[in-house]
Amino acid sequence: MRLTDLEIAACLEEGSIVIDPRPDAEAISGVSVDVKLGNQFRVFQDHTAPYIDLSGPSSEVQEALDRVMSDKIVIPEGEAFFLHPGELALAVTHESLTLPADIVGWLDGRSSLARLGLMVHVTAHRIDPGWQGKIVLEFFNSGKLPLALKPMMTIGALNFERLSSPVARPYNKRKSAKYRDQQEAVASRISQDK
């Protein structure tokens, strides 16, 4: 069952869900908690590779990703990151999230931003039980105009579901957890798939 605003507030108070910095009461509404945009981004650089062979050897996949992904881009306070039509960028939430083994989280984009063509997460919106770290956002501008994204703007909302029992292998305990404790806009680690 999805947690209500009262249940979310209680989980934050007791520490079973940790959001740091802790959101104001106004950020919790209905069944969600608003999250803000952090100041770190990554983009695909200009490149000459015609494609990335995701089924190729791990080392070749990683080399290709290293060639096309930018270094971390940090946007100073008060300035904006411009996402142009047809572009994909990675960003990160301002907040860090910690979930227990019996709660799964979901990230939803804002309807007001979607109506401008902004996808906040391309596909990955589930946050596994046991997650710890910031949430990487996969932005895509499907609109017709560039969008100015400023750190600390409300970018999405988290909602939570309590599971019938704790999971046997929470994310932060899995050896295969590629994004454990992420604190910045981490590029794809698909080359680490087994």
Curated annotation (Swiss-Prot):
Q: Where is the signal peptide?
A: none
Keyword Transmembrane among record annotations: no
Region of interest: Disordered? 172-194
Matching SUPFAM superfamilies: dUTPase-like (SSF51283)
EC number(s) on record?
Answer: 3.5.4.13
Among the GO molecular function terms of this UniProt record, one is: dCTP deaminase activity
Q: Does the keyword Cytoplasm apply?
A: no
Instruction: List the catalytic residues.
Output: 138 (proton donor/acceptor)
Question: Residues that bind dCTP, according to the entry?
Answer: 110-115, 128, 136-138, 171, 178, 182
Reaction catalysed by this enzyme: dCTP + H2O + H(+) = dUTP + NH4(+)
Gene3D superfamilies assigned:
2.70.40.10
Q: Which UniProt keywords apply?
A: Hydrolase, Nucleotide metabolism, Nucleotide-binding
Q: Which InterPro entries match?
A: dCTP_deaminase, dUTPase-like_sf, dUTPase_trimeric
Q: Kind of enzyme, top EC level?
A: hydrolase
For this chain, the annotated S-S bridges are none
* UniProt cross-references to CDD domains, sorted A to Z: trimeric_dUTPase (cd07557)
Pathway(s): Pyrimidine metabolism; dUMP biosynthesis; dUMP from dCTP (dUTP route): step 1/2
- Pfam families from the UniProt entry: DCD
Q: Which domain of life is it from?
A: Bacteria
One of its GO biological process terms is: dUTP biosynthetic process
Which family does this protein fall into? Answer: Belongs to the dCTP deaminase family.
General function of this protein: Catalyzes the deamination of dCTP to dUTP.
Query: Tell me, how does this one assemble?
Result: Homotrimer.
- What's the protein here called? dCTP deaminase
Q: What is the lineage of its organism?
A: Bacteria, Pseudomonadati, Pseudomonadota, Gammaproteobacteria, Alteromonadales
Please name the gene that encodes this protein.
dcd
